[in-house]
Amino acid sequence: YIALLDHDDLLAPDALFEVVRCVNDNEKADVIYSDEDKITADSARRFEPHFKTDFNIELLRSNNYICHLFVVKRLIVEEIGGFRNDFDGAQDYDLILRCIEKAEGIYHIPKILYHWRVHQSSTAENPESKLYAYDAGKRAIEEHLKSVGRPGKVRELYYRGFYHVTYKVKEKTGVTVCFVGNNKTDVKKCMKSIKKTAGKVKCQFIAVKSIKEVKEEQIRYEYVLFVDSSIRMISKNWMREMIGICQFPENGVVGIQLINKKNQTIYHNGFLKGQKGYAFQGQPVEAVGYFHRDEL
């Protein structure tokens, strides 16, 4: 196995023990990563703990959330040819993406095992210190998408090191839209907002009082969208964005962010497993959230 570390960063005392335990417990552990935090130049203070999700490929295509500690089987690194000079500044991001493509098992250790050193010339403290790294990161994602055969456009977001992928969608894709609600006026207004913002997607519209009323024989298209009739769509091409992710065989359900227009807060940004309520509910619309999760 090979572990990636910056020369001035620190490992937790039990970091290698935890990695070896993961390897021993999981024979298919090709890639392993852990949580991390930051540490001041004088090692006096640790801060900004990053408690990461288990492996999430769409999140990884938006930001190198894996980062540190990253451990990979040596045979995989040899197979892909190691680092590539063309991606200097984001060579670890490029390597991680290529390793992920080959890995059979990807495991997350939910413990802080890595302390990222912060100083003025590091991206941990000053994202503007290595601007070339962000273009390299964008190119790394583009190369990854080509490698896995998933055409899409990558654009940089406002904050450095964060990206958005828009996947190519088949031109003749259709969606059956099921409006849920009793108010006919709401249904008409919701339908109007969808037609105005959905983009070039064929749509079939069905109105029902509850989801239970939808019958399989009514559904004409490959994808089904359930929408509360009180909702109004405002972003352009949101439907194609949803289909872009839903079209892949590993994905079955896709949601979008809902906002409260009256007070400009997030109403719904996904469900929280094991907890009541919705992710980031009540946060300001412009908030980026915990490690930019609101934004991504």
Where do the language-model regions lie?
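Short beta-strand-to-loop acidic/aromatic patch adjacent to the donor-nucleotide binding site
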Residues: 1-10, 221-234
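Nucleotide-sugar donor-binding/catalytic module of glycosyltransferases
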Residues: 1-129, 143
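Conserved donor NDP-sugar-binding/catalytic core segment of glycosyltransferases
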Residues: 14-46, 231-275
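Short, flexible, basic/aromatic active-site loop/helix in glycosyltransferases
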Residues: 44-65, 272-296
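Cell-envelope/extracellular polymer assembly enzymes that use nucleotide-activated donors
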Residues: 94, 174-178
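Catalytic core of nucleotide-sugar-dependent glycosyltransferases
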Residues: 126-152
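Short, acidic, metal-binding catalytic loop of nucleotide-sugar glycosyltransferases
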Residues: 189-202
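Active-site-proximal specificity loops/subdomain of glycosyltransferases
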Residues: 207-220
